């Protein structure tokens, strides 16, 4: 019965004429189903997704299987609940960074493209050095999918971007390598749309998976250190400021942008940079200037500040979230 209902689509490994690793396809073209053969055993199930969720913890054979077989099971993973969330979140951030460069439906009013365009123009304008000057080395902590790294590269000798999220860093590294902007946008529910666009990234960049609270660089390595939307996404925000201070050379530039979206699952309220009487933007400024938590030894001069810079994250076609970021540019004192 199996022989009558399926046919061999792709053979990856066989022995003595017996299929050990292969993909089988439903013989009826209207069906469209694909079934794997793993260790010589065909897996022919209607509800492959449910079976995979139950079996994957014990199915160690997949890890050593041919790439095509691993890709098949990766596809099952992506269609599951966790996979949908992960794909959606990744697409959300790629869209925020590169949405203006793709051919895709634009946001409905009042969520205009101009909002995010203005956000990037603002932060790039703040980062831009004085006329005719260039940074030697710049660093973007929590670089996500890389837009700010590429922007900094236009007026830096080298820019390093680090982030803990491997998938996000992979998007940025692939964009630099292939010069192709291709990603999935979630439309609704399980429906995703593949979108493409034109983006020519600078090549004087390096992307690493690393911890912003324990970065792998010696002190004083950078002329500019930035952290966008990261301060409220680390367990100890003050430690992030300390690392930025340490990584900057004397006279270097710090760039921060944050909507202060404090969450108890990330940082204990005792770590939040605010008090009951001093709001977060004022508190952060005073900390950098050495007027609060003076034992940190921070000695920065705030050169530019914007307290409510709007930006938008697209969750899917019917969910758009507006944030207001506090952006601050500060210069480290010279000893």
Report the location of each language-model feature.
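Conserved alpha-helix/loop element of class I SAM-dependent methyltransferases that forms part
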Residues: 96, 100-135
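Conserved class I S-adenosyl-L-methionine
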Residues: 134-144, 160
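Conserved SAM/SAH-binding beta-strand->alpha-helix loop
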Residues: 165
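S-adenosyl-L-methionine
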Residues: 174-212
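A short acidic, Gly/Pro-enriched loop at the edge of an enzyme's catalytic core
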Residues: 210-225
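A short glycine-rich, Lys/Arg-flanked "PGG" loop and its adjoining helix->strand segment in the class I
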Residues: 238-250
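Conserved beta-strand signature within the Rossmann-like core of class I S-adenosyl-L-methionine
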Residues: 251-259
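Conserved Class I S-adenosyl-L-methionine
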Residues: 267-305
């Amino acid at each position: 019965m199996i022989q009558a209902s399926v046919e061999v689509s792709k053979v990856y490994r066989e022995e003595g004429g017996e299929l050990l690793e292969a993909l089988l396809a439903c013989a009826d073209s209207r069906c469209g189903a694909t079934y794997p053969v793993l260790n010589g055993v065909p897996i022919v199930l209607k509800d492959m997704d449910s079976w995979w969720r139950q079996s994957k913890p014990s199915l160690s054979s997949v890890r050593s299987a041919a790439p095509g077989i691993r890709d098949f099971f990766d596809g099952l993973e992506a269609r599951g609940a966790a996979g949908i969330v992960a794909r959606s979140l990744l697409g959300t951030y790629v869209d925020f960074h590169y949405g203006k460069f793709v051919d895709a439906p634009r946001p409905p009013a009042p969520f205009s493209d101009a909002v995010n365009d203005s956000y990037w123009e603002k932060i790039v304008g703040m980062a831009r050095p004085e006329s005719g000057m260039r940074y030697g080395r710049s660093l973007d902590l929590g670089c996500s999918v890389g837009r700010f790294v590429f922007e900094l590269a236009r007026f830096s000798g080298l820019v390093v971007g680090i982030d803990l999220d491997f998938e996000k860093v992979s998007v940025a590294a692939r964009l630099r390598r292939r010069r192709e902007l291709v990603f999935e946008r979630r439309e609704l529910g399980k429906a995703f749309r593949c979108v493409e666009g034109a983006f020519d990234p600078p090549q004087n960049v390096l992307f690493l998976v690393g911890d912003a609270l324990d970065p792998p660089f010696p002190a004083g390595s950078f002329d500019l250190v930035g952290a966008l939307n990261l301060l409220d996404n680390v367990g100890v925000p003050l430690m992030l400021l300390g690392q930025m201070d340490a990584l900057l050379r004397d006279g270097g530039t710090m760039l921060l942008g944050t909507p202060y979206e404090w969450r108890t699952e990330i940082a204990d309220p005792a770590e939040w940079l605010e008090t009951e009487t001093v709001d977060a933007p004022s508190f952060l400024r005073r900390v950098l200037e050495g007027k609060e938590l003076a034992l940190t030894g921070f000695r920065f001069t705030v050169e530019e500040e914007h307290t409510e810079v709007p930006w938008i994250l697209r969750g899917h076609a019917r969910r758009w979230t507006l944030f207001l970021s506090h952006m601050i540019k500060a210069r480290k004192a010279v000893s």
